[in-house]
Curated annotation (Swiss-Prot):
CDD domains: ATP-synt_Fo_b. This is ATP synthase subunit b. Pfam families: ATP-synt_B. GO terms for cellular component: plasma membrane; proton-transporting ATP synthase complex. Signal peptide: none annotated. It comes from Psychrobacter sp. (strain PRwf-1).
C-alpha cells in the first residue's frame, strides 16, 4: 500500500465524514446549542424580571405599610378625639347635673325656710291672740300688762 493512496483515501473518508456531519449532525447539534443558549438567555431575562418584580413588590409593600401606618395613626387620633369629646360631654353633663342638684337643694332650703317662717307667724299670731285675750280678761293696769308682755316675750 502506498502512503499517498492511504492519505488520499483517508482525506476522502474524512471529507465524507465532515460532509455527513455537516449535513445531519451539525444542524441538530447547532439546534441543541441554540436552544440551550435561548433557555439560558430566557432564564437570565426571567431572573432580571423577577429581580425587578421583587424590587417593585418591596416598594409596593413599603407603600402599603406606610399607608396602613397612616390609617392606624388617623384611627388612633380619631379615637383619642372621640374619647376626649366623651369626657368633655360627661364633665358638662356632670356640671349640669350638679347645678340642678344645687338648685333643687336651694329650692328645698327656701321652701323649708318659708314653711318655718309661716309656722312662726302662725305661732306668733296665736300667742298674740292668747296674750290679747289674757289682757282683755284681766283688768288693764300697767303692772299686769307689763308682766303679761314679759311672759309673752319669754314664750317667743
Amino acid at each position: 500500500m502506498n502512503i499517498n493512496l492511504t492519505l488520499i483515501g483517508q482525506s476522502i473518508a474524512f471529507a465524507i465524514f465532515v460532509l455527513f456531519c455537516m449535513k445531519f449532525i451539525w444542524p441538530a447539534l447547532m439546534g441543541a446549542i441554540s436552544e440551550r443558549q435561548q433557555k439560558i438567555a430566557d432564564g437570565l431575562n426571567a431572573a432580571e424580571k423577577a429581580k425587578a418584580d421583587l424590587a417593585s413588590a418591596e416598594q409596593s409593600v413599603e407603600q402599603e405599610l406606610a399607608t396602613a401606618k397612616a390609617k392606624a395613626a388617623a384611627l388612633i387620633e380619631q379615637a383619642n378625639k372621640s374619647a376626649n369629646q366623651l369626657i368633655e360631654e360627661a364633665k358638662a353633663q356632670a356640671q349640669v347635673e350638679g347645678e340642678r342638684i344645687r338648685q333643687q337643694a336651694r329650692e328645698s332650703i327656701d321652701l323649708e325656710i318659708n314653711q318655718a317662717r309661716e309656722s312662726l307667724r302662725t305661732q306668733v299670731s296665736e300667742l298674740a291672740v292668747l296674750g290679747a285675750e289674757q289682757i282683755l280678761k284681766e283688768k288693764v293696769d300697767q303692772q299686769t300688762h307689763a308682766n303679761m308682755l314679759n311672759e309673752l316675750a319669754a314664750k317667743l
